[in-house]
Amino acid sequence: IGDADIVHTDTEKSHANIEAGVRAILAAGAVPVVIGGDHSVNIPCINAFDGQEPFHLVQIDAHLDFVDERHGVRYGHGNPMRRAAEKPYVTGLSQVGIRNVSSTARDGYEDARSMGSDIVSVRQFRKMGVDAMLDRIPEGARYYVTIDIDGFDPSIAAGTGTPSHGGFLYYEVLEFLDGLTRRGNIVGAVSYTHLTLPTT
């Protein structure tokens, strides 16, 4: 349906415009694929699923994005997974690739786990392998997938404002997503890309 109207000085209005667009896509019986913005775009995208069947959220990211509030902000790029976990139709979260632990305090990790999150680092993912990771995700569920570009290693995706070494390589994520599509249905996909282009 094209771009959502983004008002750079008004996050609330921008989020309302994104939510309206995603609701229109869902009403048409299509799968919303949302590209761009910062990771807060997940908040309105997930809000748009209110009234839909429940889903399991799969996040590929370097950061947990589970801060409840920071400097008075509850709907920014550090909050979307916390806001998602509060929704009754989000049955659980698989947070995969998490490695930049400085972005969320210890209590954020404890809160995430207590609210149904399975947190897996890149090192843990590689040690267990794709199949074992997939086995940790409920089979036959509806999946909402969100990918932050910093989930990838900066050697292949340097154009992020928050590069974090030790990230995923392209084919690791591709194989994981391929396996996920064989376990259940993808009902939404959000990819966060920064404004700067990857360098070569």
Protein language model annotation of sequence segments:
Residues 1-56, 103, 119-121, 126-137, ...:
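Metal-dependent C-N hydrolase catalytic cores
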Residues 17, 41, 64-67, 72-85, ...:
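Active-site glycine-rich loop that binds ribose-phosphate moieties when present
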Residues 34-36, 59-61, 95-97, 146-150, ...:
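Short beta-strand segments
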Residues 70-73, 158-166:
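Short glycine-enriched, charge-decorated loop/helix-capping segments at active-site entrances
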Residues 94-157:
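Active-site rim beta-loop-alpha module in soluble metabolic enzymes
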Residues 164-176:
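Gly/Ser/Thr-rich active-site loops/lids in small-molecule metabolic enzymes
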Residues 193-199:
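Conserved small/polar residues in nucleotide/adenosyl-binding loops
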